[in-house]
């Protein structure tokens, strides 16, 4: 997703500097051109050769390196950069950046850069909370820098509090959100449902299905990367939600219906990936049903749950897009086309549970995108790629 993108990582003197090697590796795996600039103090914590080995690029430390091919490298790299992240960012370098001091390769390059700039402070809690440091952070925010709030925990100095640099995965997510995709959903509100609802039989047992929420999560992440404000309504799921999305947790079909209906009017796009129960017990027991309890029959009486997709289709706002999912074991196209018309949806994503690589719990999917105009059959691919294809098709409607 980062092919053709130039990422500059500025590493300062902090014990957390070693973690940036992992971040650099993650970015390279996404085909980014990763360039690392280190302060001299940072080289006391991690060797520049580590970054050169991981990225395939020379690690820059000295502004006046006579052995390097660029005469004015700080300007050349600043022009090429698609994003500049300083992590870990010491109080010293934060102060320099906030006040326009350019006395080394890192501060000189970032002063010349016009790309998005992210800063991840890492220092002792008392240093981080010092009013001077906080003033410098506010000044950088005023100048358009995005500050990544440090985590709290046990610090290398022995103190406990704010000042820990977030884990590389978190920093990676910030970079991905900023430059991974064209922001063709900027300003749009997107609601996505995911996972399996649970319908209570008694306090111990419930009716559910095999949905894990992986497809819904993938779509939520894709929409977030494309600039949308995303609300993810999660039933029972086996995956963590992506960063930068609003998550609402629900249990039953009725819970999900209440949340979706309350938020539907403000959404530009609604995508119903959740496997919502069609039936629920009419009279769930307040106490656990015992096998030898003669007061309970062996038959559980069921009633239909509300059809959320039908409600959305009936109350669809002008310009709003509604996308449903169809899991079939036979007559997939016929049943899914009928569902599209009956529910007044704009698109149905259909998949056949019996096809290898499709369905619940897998990291891949095999789907057909069905609209009133056409059917597009996709080959087996990772669910993140399926998510991108779904959104590409919706945005053409």
Summary of predicted features, one role per range:
Residues 1-118, 124-213, 217-397:
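A cross-family phosphate/adenosyl-ligand binding-site feature
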């Amino acid at each position: 997703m980062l092919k053709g993108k130039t990422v500059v990582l500025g590493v300062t003197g902090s014990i957390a500097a070693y973690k940036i090697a992992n971040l650099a590796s993650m970015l390279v795996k996404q085909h980014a051109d990763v360039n690392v600039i280190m302060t001299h103090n940072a080289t006391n914590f991690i060797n520049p050769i580590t970054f050169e080995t991981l990225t395939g690029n020379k690690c820059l430390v000295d502004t006046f390196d006579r052995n390097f091919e660029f005469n004015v490298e700080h300007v050349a790299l600043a022009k090429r950069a698609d994003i500049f992240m300083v992590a870990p960012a010491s109080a010293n370098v934060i102060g320099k950046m906030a006040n326009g001091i350019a006395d080394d390769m890192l501060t000189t390059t970032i002063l010349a850069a016009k790309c998005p700039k992210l800063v991840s402070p890492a220092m002792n809690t008392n240093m981080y909370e010092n009013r001077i440091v906080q003033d410098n952070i506010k000044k950088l925010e005023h100048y358009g820098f995005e500050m990544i709030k440090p985590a709290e925990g046990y610090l290398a100095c022995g103190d406990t509090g704010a000042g820990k640099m977030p884990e590389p995965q978190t920093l990676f997510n910030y970079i991905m959100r900023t430059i991974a995709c064209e922001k063709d959903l900027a300003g749009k509100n997107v609601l996505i449902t995911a996972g399996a609802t649970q319908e209570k039989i008694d306090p111990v047992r419930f009716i559910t299905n095999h949905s894990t929420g992986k497809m819904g999560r993938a779509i939520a992440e894709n929409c977030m990367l494309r600039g949308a404000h995303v609300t993810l309504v999660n039933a029972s799921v086996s995956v963590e939600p992506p960063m930068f999305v609003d998550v609402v947790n629900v249990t039953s079909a009725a819970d999900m219906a209440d949340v979706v209906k309350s938020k539907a009017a403000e959404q530009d796009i609604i995508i119903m990936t959740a496997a919502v129960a069609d039936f629920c017990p009419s009279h769930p027991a307040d106490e656990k049903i015992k096998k030898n309890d003669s007061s309970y029959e062996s038959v559980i009486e069921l009633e239909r749950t509300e059809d959320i997709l039908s409600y959305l289709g009936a109350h669809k706002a002008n310009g709003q897009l509604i996308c449903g999912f169809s899991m079939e074991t036979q007559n997939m196209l016929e049943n899914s086309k009928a569902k599209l018309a009956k529910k007044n949806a704009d698109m149905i994503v259909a998949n056949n549970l019996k096809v290898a690589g499709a369905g619940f719990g897998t990291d891949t999917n095999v789907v057909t995108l069905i609209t009133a105009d056409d059917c597009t059959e996709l080959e087996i691919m990772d669910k993140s790629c399926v998510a991108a294809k779904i959104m590409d098709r919706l945005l053409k409607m």
